[in-house]
Amino acid sequence: MTSFFDSDSSSNVAEYSVSELSGSIKRTLEQAFEHVRVRGEISGYRGPHSSGHAYFALKDDRARMEAVIWKGTFARLKLRPEEGMEVIATGRVTTFPGSSKYQIVIDSLEPAGAGALMALLEERKRKLAAEGLFDAARKRPLPFMPKVIGVVTSPTGAVIRDILHRIADRFPVHVVVWPVRVQGDGASEEVAAAIRGFNALEEGGPIPRPDVLIVARGGGSLEDLWGFNDEAVVRAVAASGIPLISAVGHETDWTLIDYASDQRAPTPTGAAEMAVPVKADLEAQVANLSARLQAAATRQMDHRRHALRALARALPSLDQLLALPRRRFDEAAAGLGRGLQMNTANKRRSFERIAAHLRPELLTTRIREQRRHLLEAINKAERCVERQIDRRQARVSAADASLRTLPSRLAGQIHRSSDRVSGLGRRADAAMAAEMRRLKGALAAQDRVLQSLSYRNVLQRGFALVRDAAGDPVKQAAAVTAGMALSLEFADGRVSAVAGEEGAPPPAAPKKRASRPVVPTKQGSLF
C-alpha cells in the first residue's frame, strides 16, 4: 500500500506560486491578444468615474468581458460609450492579478453596423433638436444674388468640379474653396473649422467674406458620411452667421447638418443651382419687365394726352382769355398818356399864369431858366414814361406770344403789368406835383427877394422918385433945368412939379385939392 506522502518528488510538472502563475497568465494574454477587436454590447456603463476613467462590460448572449477606458483615451474618443450600444472595441487584453480577472483596455470605439449607427444618430438628433438647433425660426433666406460663395469640400474629385461648372454656367461669381477632408479621421474637425473660419473673415479683408456657404460631399455609405453627423460640425453649422447650404451625399442621404443648415440641396450640383440664379433668365426677365414698363408708360402717356386734349377743348380760346386783360391794358395805357398830357398842360398853364405877373427884369432871366428846366423835366418825364410804356408794351407783347402755350401765366402777367403801369402813372403824378411844389417855392422865394429890392420900400421911408416928362427917372440934379416939368412919386401917389432956378424961393403952396385915389400900378402881388 502506497502512502499519500510517498509521492514521487522527481516529477517533471513545474510548481508555481499564485503570483507566478497570475503573472505568467498576464504575460501570455497580453502577448497573444496585444491588439484585438471585440464586438459586443455595452453593459453597466454609468459614465466616467471621478478619476476620469470609464468602467463597463462588453457582452453578448453567451459571455461577458470587463472593459476599461483610461482618462487620456476617453477624451480622444469619437464615439462616446452609451448603455446598450453595440460597438466594436479595439484594444488589448490583460488581467488584474489581484482578482484573477481579465479585461480589455480599449483604445477606440466604433459602432457595430448600420443599426448601431442609426440608433446613435437618432439619439444625437433628439438631443440637438431639444436644444433648438433644428428650429425653422433659426433658418435664414439665401441671398438672391451673392457676390462671393464659400465652398467647404475636398479640393479633388467631381464635387468641386460640378459646383464650379454649374456656377459658371448659371451666373459666374467669385468662389472661395476651403479644402477639407470629407471622410476618415479628422474630417469632422476640419469641416467645423472651415465653417468657423469663413465666419471669422472680415468684410473688405484680403480674402473676401462669402455671402453664402456650401458644405458638399459626394454620395457614400452611412459610415462614409458619418463625419457630417458629428456634433461639433452640427453646432458649427447652427452657429454660422453666413447662410449655409448642405449638399452631402445623394437625395436619399440625410445627415444632421441637413437639419441645422438654412437650405438642404439633394446634390452638390443642386446646391450650386440654389446659390445663384440663371443669368440668362434674369436678363430675359429684365427685358420682359422693361418692355412691359415701356408699354405701360406709352399707354399712360396716350391716356394723359387724350385727357389733356379733352381738357384743352373745354377751355376758352387764347384770344377770349386775353380780350378783357388786353382791353383793360389799352385803356390804362391810353388813360395814362392823356392824363400825363393834361397834367402837363395844366401845370404849364398854371406856371404861365404865375409867370405873367412877374415883371421885374431881375427875375426874368431866373424865371426863364427855371421854365427851361421845368420843360426839360417835363419832357424827360414824358420820355421816361413813354420808354416805360414802350418797355411794358414790349414785355406784354412777349408775354402775349409766350402765353399762347401758357394761358394762365400770361393772364397773371398782364394783370401784374397793368398794376405796374398804374403804379408808374401814380409815381409820375407824384413826381410832377413834387416838381411844381418845388418851383412854386422857388418863385415865392424870388418874389420875396423882389419885394425886398423894390424902390417902393425906399419911398415908404419918406423919399420920392423924380421922373422927367418921358417918365424916366432923374438921377442927378444937373440933369434938371429951370422950367422942366417933373413928376414926383411918393409912397402914396404922384405929384407934378416945375423946376425953378437954383437959389429961387420956393413957390407958394397951391390950394389944397381933393386927393385922388391911388391908381394901382401894374406891379401887383406875386400870388
Curated annotation (Swiss-Prot):
Subcellular locations according to the entry: Cytoplasm
One Gene Ontology MF term: exodeoxyribonuclease VII activity
Pfam family, one: tRNA_anti_2
InterPro entries per UniProt: Exonuc_VII_L, Exonuc_VII_lsu_C, OB-fold_nuc-bd_dom
Main localization, broad class: cytoplasm
Region feature Disordered, mapped onto this chain: 499-527
Keywords of this entry: Cytoplasm, Exonuclease, Hydrolase, Nuclease
Keyword Signal recorded: no
Reactions the enzyme catalyzes: Exonucleolytic cleavage in either 5'- to 3'- or 3'- to 5'-direction to yield nucleoside 5'-phosphates
Known EC number: 3.1.11.6
GO cellular component terms listed in the entry, alphabetical order: cytoplasm; exodeoxyribonuclease VII complex
GO biological process terms, semicolon-separated: DNA catabolic process
Assembly, per entry: Heterooligomer composed of large and small subunits.
Protein family per UniProt: Belongs to the XseA family.
Function in brief: Bidirectionally degrades single-stranded DNA into large acid-insoluble oligonucleotides, which are then degraded further into small acid-soluble oligonucleotides.
Protein name: Exodeoxyribonuclease 7 large subunit
Organism: Sinorhizobium fredii (strain NBRC 101917 / NGR234)
Gene for this chain: xseA
